[in-house]
Every structure is written in structure tokens, then in C-alpha cells.
UniProtKB/Swiss-Prot annotation:
One of its GO terms (biological process) is L-histidine biosynthetic process. Its EC number is 2.6.1.9. The modification N6-(pyridoxal phosphate)lysine is found at K209. The gene is hisC. Belongs to the class-II pyridoxal-phosphate-dependent aminotransferase family. Histidinol-phosphate aminotransferase subfamily. This is Histidinol-phosphate aminotransferase. GO terms for molecular function: histidinol-phosphate transaminase activity; pyridoxal phosphate binding. The lineage of its organism: Bacteria, Pseudomonadati, Pseudomonadota, Gammaproteobacteria, Vibrionales. NCBIfam families: hisC. Signal peptide: none annotated.
Amino acid sequence: MEKLARKSVQKLTPYLSARRIGGTGDVWLNANESPFDNEYRTNFARLNRYSDCQPKALIAAYAAYAGVKPEQTLTSRGADEGIELLIRAFCETNEDAILYCPPTYGMYSVSAETIGVERKTVPLTEDWQLDLSGIEANLDKVKLVFVCSPNNPTGNLVKREDIIALLEMTKDRAIVVMDEAYIDFCPEASTVDLLAQYSNLAILRTLSKAFALAGLRCGFTLANEELINVLLKVIAPYPVPVPVAEIATQALSEAGLARAKFQVLDLNANRAYLQVGLSMIAGLEVFEGWGNYLLVKFPNGDELFKAAWESGIILRNSPIKDCVRISVGSRDECEKTLGFIRNYYS
């Protein structure tokens, strides 16, 4: 049957998510998930009816949390669907292109390739910042520029002045898509305030990380109302199941927000603990991280990754030579991981 698939799909290499890669163990620090398993009321009614395309209570709650108007907010099945919607809505197949800056999140490329949209890359600089001159030289045919901050997998923040320069550079030419999946761990670095000034800005958000709802698959796109209305033309008629909308709305309640804030503080403290501990091991380079993960360069990254895997500590290998990404888990998980790495290099 594969021969019946589109040629581009036949050639496609699927994104290898943490779950696809698999593994067995009791310490899972490979998918940037939260260690907190929060409880929600699940006495759902109305499951015999379709959900609203954009549930009003959920949209209102997230808009209030993000500091935007409900008309500037769209919810979808994770931020991944937001990526796909933007490409489908704004890029002509075999005509337009997207641009992204590796090393970064892999789904920008996969979504574009699946739809038949050209992918242009301008690698990040040595300190993992935007190469603005390189981007400007490659903007021909580009409709969307994806920027992840905090960047996955490197963990760093993209300089605000560079984001503004990029928005100015792409005015009336392309949309800058800021992937803020991890911004809840450093909300002061958000670009949401720039929406009022730049109509060519779209922001991706998720409840998977700081809100501990990776299994719920609930994301958001923030943008000006005109852009949101374009996305509403291509989104599925019932993208958010009733249970998803109700649990997400609970997570965004006053009590839910207070809990998320406390858990973010806890995870940021665990990140600092892990960063200091790893930095004290000779031969390791620990990069500053602003999300719920750290990128670490080892003398022999692939060997360390494999040894940890075989010991039941599941980390995430990286396209960056000898680098491994470590999610920030519970204090117990961080202690076990740190202890294993110390012993490995002792």
C-alpha cells in the first residue's frame, strides 16, 4: 500500500517522539513532561454531543491567563496542530517555504514536508542565537519563520532585540511564529506584549509542560484577530473533545493557576539543583536552561545515553554531538540521575 502514498510521504522520516523511541525504566526524563500527576473532576456529561469548535469557557480562561483578547486566541490538539494549521493556511504547496533555525524542534520540518512545502534552514549561531543576516538572505518564498524560545533542545532564550528585528524584517513578507511551549517557566521572556504592535506575529502555547497535561493534548495559538480567523477556516470542525475542554478549563481556574505556579517554582528549583550538581562533574558542560530541561555535553554522549538507558534512566539523545537533553523531573528522579552520572564518571 505504501506505493499508493504520495511520493513525498513515501520519502518522509517521521518525527521520533519519546514514546515512539520507547524504553523501559523507572526514571523517565526524555519528553519534558511534568512529574506531577494532578487530579481533575471527570464526571462528564454531554458526551453524546459534539464539542464546540472553540469552547468559550476555555478560550476565555486562556486569553485571560495569557493577557490577550478571546478573539486573539485559538485552541487546538496541542501546539503541534497549531504548527500544521499555520502551514496549511498560509503556505501554497510546491510554491512557498517555511524557515527555521536548527538545532530546534523537529515538527516544523515534518509538518511542512508532509504538506509539500519547502523547508529552508538557517542554523543558529555558536551561542544559539538567530543569524539575522542569514535569515534575511533566505526570505525569498518564505511565508513562516519558526523561532522556539526557550529553544528545544538547547534551552536558551532568543534575544528579545533579535526577535523584534526579525519582526521588522518580515513585515508584509512573512509571519514570525514564536514557539513558547516552555515560556511558563520564564513568563517574563514572553513576546505576547508584541502582538499589539506586530500583526505578523503568532505565538504557540501548550498545557503539556508547566500545566502537567501532556496527555491531554491541548494547545493554543495567539495572534491578531485577522490571523486567527484565517486559521479557523482550516481547523477541524470539532478539534477539542469535551473532556479536554473541561479539564483544561479547570487547570486555568484560580486554583489551577495557583497549583501550576507552585509546581513551576518546584521544577525551576529542581533544574537549578540538577544544573549545579552536573556542573561539578569534571568534563561536563551544562548549558543554561530556561525550560523544564537541560542540555548537557558529555565526553561521550552516545555512550552515556545508552548506559543510562540500560540502567532504567531514560534520557533524550540530541542531534548536537555528544549532547544529551535531560528533563527536569521530581527531586528523587533528579537525584537518581545525578547519582548515576557521577558514578559513571568516577
